[in-house]
A protein has these predicted regions:
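Catalytic cores of extracellular degradative/oxidative enzymes
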Residues: 2-193
Length: 194
């Protein structure tokens, strides 16, 4: 594509993406819209290279500074444009948007100590909610007590008067927060977007 380069098993492309252009357009849309969100176009600093996504066989999903990787068992979801763009669910787009988001994280602007996994979810929420018109994960996901993530964040951060950077932490060990809920941390950032 124009913004993304995908390398997966040929059989997976044939099985899940009969029209290759559809999945290419889907990933181009993710990458381009993340670049817009991060201000790459506004400040004329758009990367010259495509985002590289490829299959691997030893982990789930991860990102480095130069590629993202997806375990072969995810191919059915992430190579199917209908599943990626499904407006009635949170779809399969969250994972790739999250990993591509790691490659786009602005340093030091949105990459603070202890907040990496929170701030990378800003583009994931943006892509799934605004670009693919899927329900917000913060509003739709029900937690163990039946509340959504917004309700939990409100009761913990606002009512509980807890700094959002430590939202959900259960204790501190050697100065490192344990059990931080990155989705509770995400709520105040997402409020800025709304």
């Amino acid at each position: 594509g124009k913004y993304a380069h995908l390398t997966f098993e040929t059989a997976n492309f044939r099985n899940y993406t009969p029209e290759g252009r559809d999945i290419t357009n889907t990933y181009d849309s993710i990458v381009r819209n993340e670049w817009v969100l991060h201000g790459y176009y506004k400040y004329n600093c758009k990367p010259r290279n495509r985002m590289y996504l490829h299959v691997m066989y030893h982990a789930y999903m991860y990102a480095t500074w130069y590629h993202t990787a997806y375990v072969v068992s995810t191919a059915e979801a992430i190579l199917d444009p209908a599943k990626m763009r499904n407006p009635k669910s949170q779809g399969a787009a969250w994972g790739p948007s999250h990993e591509i988001g790691h490659m786009n994280q602005i340093r030091p602007g949105a990459l603070w100590h202890g907040m990496t996994e929170c701030t990378v979810n800003i583009p994931s929420e943006y892509i799934t909610t605004y670009v693919f018109k899927q329900p917000s994960r913060l509003q739709e996901e029900r937690m163990g007590d039946g509340n959504n993530r917004y309700s939990l964040a409100f009761s913990h951060i606002i009512a509980g008067e807890t700094p959002f950077c430590s939202a959900g932490s259960t204790n501190s060990k050697d100065g490192v927060m344990q059990g931080v809920d990155v989705f509770k941390q995400l709520v105040p950032f997402w409020q800025l977007e709304l």
